[in-house]
Amino acid sequence: MPPQNSSDWLHGFQTGADWFLACGNGLEQATASLCDPHAQSPSTVLLVGTREGEAARQALLPGHSHSRSRGVAQLQADGSTLDDEHPLLVASLDMDNVCTKQKPPPKHNARSRYKVAWLSESSPTAEAGSFVENVVGKLLLPFVDVVCLFLDDFSTREAGIRFLQRCGRHSRLSLGWRPQVILASSSTYRHKGSLGLPMFGSIQRVVLPADGRKTLSFSRFRALKNTILTSVKTVRKRRSASKTLYSAYHLNAFFESALRHVATCASSPFSFILATRECNQIQDRLWLCLRDFLRLCAANHTSQEAALEYMASALMLDSLPPGMHRKYATRAIMFPF
């Protein structure tokens, strides 16, 4: 029997004074649905809202079942992109749902769960809203390419911007890893001064047509989908150039590592580079191997440029997660020092 709510990506809940994070089945199920998850590099858009956010999710995922989430976030793959080199994953955050007190998920709906040590110890009376902002900023933002904020789903449009600002303050993402933002609303939104979103990339605005009985859901959100596709393509090019465009298989494994890290450590952000080393530790004898290699190069009169290019290639390939070597050809990462 398939698990219920298999699209739940992340669960967060409080038991007594303790907070917990649990990994849902959403990302694993989406990865399994792809034709070759080791070779496909998906892009992820995070929809943040309530009514409009849910309507957009249904328009972007036609044919999917849309059961109400029991977790902090849901995630599903766009069925029309399952065979694509870069599938689209659609994640959603229902603000009406995540900020209410949640119960622990059924065992079949969560793969692993971790106590949020730093939150339980430092602020045992933390509110659900503060918990969600921490989790979105520290855990979800590093795994999404685009954040789509539905301003009309908040009490005021400024409240929606403030929510994203608070999430951004917790993220500490590097310049090349910041997701782009799409502000969706029923009318043109003009904010006085800066939006105050330094932890995000470029910001675009989309005006949604009025929701009428004769308006098809897909047609209403067509402009939004086109903007999403353009934005994820821009982010994908940037990450491909920096050799940080990971496969679906590796993103699934990375998320488990990130979940564990965020739950246990508040002082440092999750690092994809360090995560690749968890099961692939650098040997203590590395410097001895390099010394011996350079001696052989000197004995065989190998040019300095050739020796350094070879060493750079070996070190770069070794730093990639297992299985990603075929994604980036050796010559593509060889460079002179």
Question: What positions do the PLM features span?
Answer:
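Conserved GTPase G-domain substructure that encodes guanine base recognition and part of the catalytic core
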Residues: 1-337
